[in-house]
Curated annotation (Swiss-Prot):
List of residues that carry Phosphohistidine: H242
Name of the protein this chain belongs to: Nicotinate phosphoribosyltransferase
Native source species: Rhizobium leguminosarum bv. trifolii (strain WSM2304)
GO molecular function, one term: nicotinate phosphoribosyltransferase activity
InterPro entries found in the cross-reference section: N/Namide_PRibTrfase, NAPRTase_N, Nic_PRibTrfase, Nic_PRibTrfase-Fam, Nicotinate_pribotase-like_C
GO cellular component terms listed in the entry, alphabetical order: cytosol
Primary role: Catalyzes the synthesis of beta-nicotinate D-ribonucleotide from nicotinate and 5-phospho-D-ribose 1-phosphate at the expense of ATP.
Length: 434
C-alpha cells in the first residue's frame, strides 16, 4: 500500500478529498456480526443511540464546528456498500468460517444507508441522537464516534504550519514505533487493532495498522476495522458488545427476564456463531452478578473479554470461576481490551503467561496517542472518553452498569434500580481516560 504523507495531507486539507467516513465498512467487525443477529432475531425492535462525552471538561460544541459536523454526518448517510465490498463480505472467510454472512442478510445490507440523526447543543456539548429501527441505528455508533474524534483533531491542528505538522507526526510515529519495539519482547503475543472509534484520524489508524503489520509480524492478528482488514489483507476481528444485553434487559417484562437477559443474548449468539466467536462479555450489569447466575454451559464457551475491571483483577476473577466450574483455564481465552497501553499489555501478559490463552485489543492508546508530540502542548490532541450507547429500546430505558461506576450509562433512577437488582459488589471506581 502506498504511503501517505499525513502531515502534508492535513496541511493541504480539503473536505472533498478527505471525508472522515469513506465506507460503510469503515466500522468495527463486531457491528456487522451483531447487525446480522439483530436483523435475523430482532427485526422489529426500535432502539435509540446517544452520544455521551464522559470527559465533561472538554466542551465539544466549542471545539467542533456544527456545520462541519453536519457535513460529515450527512456525507456518511450517502454511503452504500460497493460491489467490491459486497463480494469480499460474501466470499471471505472470517474466524475460519466461510459465508458467515447469510445471502439474504447481504442482500438487505447491499441497499442499507445510515438513517437520520438529531443534533443540537446544550451546555457546551453536542446532543447527538439516533432514533429508529435497531437494525439501522446500531450502525451509527462507530462512524459517529470516528467523526467527532477526527473533527476534534482537525480543529486542534488547523492553525499549525507545515513544519510543525511534520514534527508532530514524526514524533507520533517515533512514539508509536517505540511501543512496537517493546511488544517484540513478548513471545507468543497476540494483539489486534481495536482503535477505530476514538482514532486521531482514518489515515493515522491506517499507518498504525501498517506499522504493526511490519513491526511485530504474526503477533499482530488483525484489525477490528473492516475496511482496513479488506484493504490490508488482514483478519477482521471482534465478537459482540454491551448493546445486546442492554437492549435485552430493557425489553424485559419480568424480574426473571431481566436476570436472564445476558444469557438469552448468549443463546441467541450461539444460534448464529460458534468457535472463536463464542466470547463472553460479562460486565454489562457487573461481572460478579454475571458469574453468580451464569448457567454451567457458559463455562464451555471459548473465552471471556473482561472489559471494565482492571485487567489483572478481572482476569483472575474469571480464572477462579473457570476453576470453580471444573474447567482448565489453560484451554480458555481471555481478551483484554479496556484502555490498554503498552505498559498494561506487558504487565498483564507477564502476569498470566502460561496460565491462560491471551489476546489483546489495543484501542485509543494505539490510534490516538499524540501526548507530548506537538512542539507546544495542544489539549485538543489529547484523547477523550466519548461513547455512543443505547439509550432506550422500544421506548424503555437502557442501562449499562459496568465493573467501573464511572462507565455506567442510563437514566440515574434506572441505574439505581439495576444496581439494587444485580448488586454492586466488586465494582472498582477508576477514572476513565479513554
Amino acid at each position: 500500500m502506498a504511503r501517505t504523507d499525513i502531515a502534508r495531507r492535513v496541511y493541504n486539507h480539503a473536505w472533498k478529498l478527505d471525508p472522515i467516513i469513506r465506507s460503510l465498512i469503515d466500522t468495527d467487525f463486531y457491528k456487522l456480526l451483531m447487525l446480522q443477529m439483530i436483523w435475523k432475531l430482532y427485526p422489529d425492535v426500535n432502539a435509540s443511540f446517544t452520544l455521551i462525552n464522559r470527559t465533561k471538561r472538554v466542551r465539544l460544541a466549542d471545539e467542533i464546528d456544527e456545520g462541519e459536523l453536519r457535513e460529515q454526518l450527512d456525507h456518511a448517510r450517502t454511503l452504500k456498500l460497493s460491489k467490491k465490498e459486497m463480494i469480499w463480505l460474501a466470499g471471505n472467510s472470517f474466524y475460519g468460517r466461510a459465508q458467515i454472512f447469510e445471502p439474504e442478510f447481504l442482500a438487505w445490507l447491499s441497499n442499507f444507508q445510515l438513517p437520520e440523526y438529531e443534533l443540537s447543543k446544550k451546555d457546551g456539548q453536542y446532543v447527538l441522537d439516533f432514533h429508529g429501527s435497531w437494525k439501522e441505528t446500531t450502525m451509527w455508533e462507530i462512524p459517529a464516534l470516528a467523526i467527532v474524534n477526527e473533527l476534534r483533531s482537525r480543529s486542534a491542528m488547523r492553525a499549525l504550519g507545515p513544519f510543525t505538522l511534520d514534527v508532530l507526526y514524526a514524533r507520533a510515529k517515533a512514539k508509536m514505533w517505540s511501543k512496537v519495539e517493546r511488544l517484540k519482547e513478548l513471545p507468543g503475543l497476540r494483539i489486534s487493532d481495536f482503535g477505530t472509534r476514538r482514532r486521531h484520524s482514518f489515515l493515522w489508524q491506517r499507518w498504525c495498522v501498517e506499522a504493526l503489520k511490519e513491526g511485530i509480524g504474526p503477533a499482530f492478528t488483525g484489525t477490528s476495522n473492516v475496511l482496513l482488514a479488506m484493504d490490508s489483507d488482514l483478519e477482521a476481528v471482534g465478537t459482540n458488545a454491551h448493546e445486546l444485553p442492554m437492549v435485552a434487559a430493557a425489553l424485559a417484562q419480568t424480574d426473571e427476564q431481566l436476570r436472564n437477559a445476558p444469557y438469552k443474548i448468549l443463546r441467541d449468539w450461539n444460534k448464529l456463531y460458534g468457535g472463536n466467536l463464542l466470547i463472553v462479555l460479562p460486565d454489562a450489569f457487573g461481572t460478579a452478578a454475571f458469574l453468580r447466575d451464569a448457567p454451567e454451559w457458559v463455562a464451555d464457551w471459548t473465552g471471556f473479554r473482561p472489559d471494565s475491571a482492571p485487567p489483572i483483577e478481572g482476569g483472575e476473577k474469571i480464572i477462579d470461576w473457570w476453576k470453580k466450574m471444573g474447567r482448565d483455564p489453560r484451554q480458555k481465552l481471555l481478551i483484554f481490551s479496556d484502555g490498554l497501553d503498552v505498559d498494561a499489555i506487558i504487565d498483564t501478559y507477564r502476569h498470566f503467561e502460561g496460565r491462560v490463552r491471551m489476546s489483546f485489543g489495543w484501542g485509543t492508546n494505539l490510534t490516538n496517542d499524540f501526548s507530548g508530540c506537538a512542539p507546544t502542548e495542544i489539549s485538543g490532541l489529547n484523547p477523550i472518553s466519548v461513547v455512543c450507547k443505547v439509550s432506550d429500546a422500544d421506548g424503555r430505558p437502557a442501562v449499562k452498569l459496568s465493573d467501573n461506576p464511572q462507565k455506567a450509562t442510563g437514566d440515574p433512577a434506572e441505574v439505581e434500580r439495576y444496581l439494587k437488582f444485580f448488586g454492586a459488589e466488586d465494582r472498582i471506581d477508576q477514572t476513565v481516560l479513554v
